[in-house]
UniProtKB/Swiss-Prot annotation:
HAMAP family: ArgB (MF_00082). It comes from Methanobrevibacter smithii (strain ATCC 35061 / DSM 861 / OCM 144 / PS). The gene is argB. Belongs to the acetylglutamate kinase family. ArgB subfamily. InterPro entries: AceGlu_kinase-like_sf (IPR036393), AcgluKinase_fam (IPR004662), ArgB (IPR037528), Asp/Glu/Uridylate_kinase (IPR001048), NAGK-C (IPR041727). It catalyses: N-acetyl-L-glutamate + ATP = N-acetyl-L-glutamyl 5-phosphate + ADP. One of its GO terms (cellular component) is cytoplasm. It is found in: Cytoplasm. Substrate binds at residues 60-61, 82, 187. This is Acetylglutamate kinase. Disulfide bonds: none annotated.
Amino acid sequence: MKDVNILVEALPYIKKFHEKKILIKYGGHAMIDEDAMSSTVRDTVLLKYVGMEPLIVHGGGPEISRSMDKLGKEPKFIKGLRVTDEETMEIIEMVLVGKISTDIVSQISYHDGKGISLSGKDSRLIFAHKKPVSKVTSESGGEEEIDLGLVGEIDCINTDLLEMFLKNNYIPVISPVGIADDGSSLNLNADTAAGEIASSVDAEKLIILTDVPGVLRDPNDPDSLIQRIKIDEVPDLIEEGVISGGMIPKIETCVKAIEDGVKSCHIIDGRKKHSLLLEIFTKNGIGTMIYK
């Protein structure tokens, strides 16, 4: 009887999100657990079979750093952003496009779905420009220039390409690599790419799978989860330090996506099995929802 009740509870959400686009951002830190990854991919295929249109944008930071270590290349970061020279860019593409994306597509096929691996360079899916050199105040009080190298800022998304694959029942799996005007590759922030794609395709939801339960009022207390945040509450939560560190850019991505038309954004723990289904098909969901 319990299983029947679960199915009955899911029905309104299956109807509500039928033929709606769901953008799933799968973070690199959430991919470390292979069982959870397999579960997430299987659940994504299920979304497709019940009539939704899921798209995946994946990260891969930990895997990129491990590959760089193996190749004797020291990862460098400035304010949390990876400094990207030409050699680093080659490694990033090798890991994101050549390994992670194809692994996800293989998992989709294993679960009887149709996946397609896409880089932002394919048919200029993600057109971008190099992030300008910026000036910041140094520790000594003077100005210093920061050049992140081949790091990009997104200009536009080729939605026609994505719509073509969605109409043919594919699940697009997108690596956050952009293409510049001269054809060169640019390293993109995966959260930002996910937000831009979500708003460009008029996604109903943007779901960010990461390695924390959501936004916690006390980072040491998992029971302090904030379940719902309105976008106009975000500045105060940042000022109070409730939203801090790596959570800030994720929340900022969510705020921009909602301002650009996405109905709601969700930050959930991708390490938890079936977290995707729990978020979409249950009344209370899990994690933190950001909305207007």
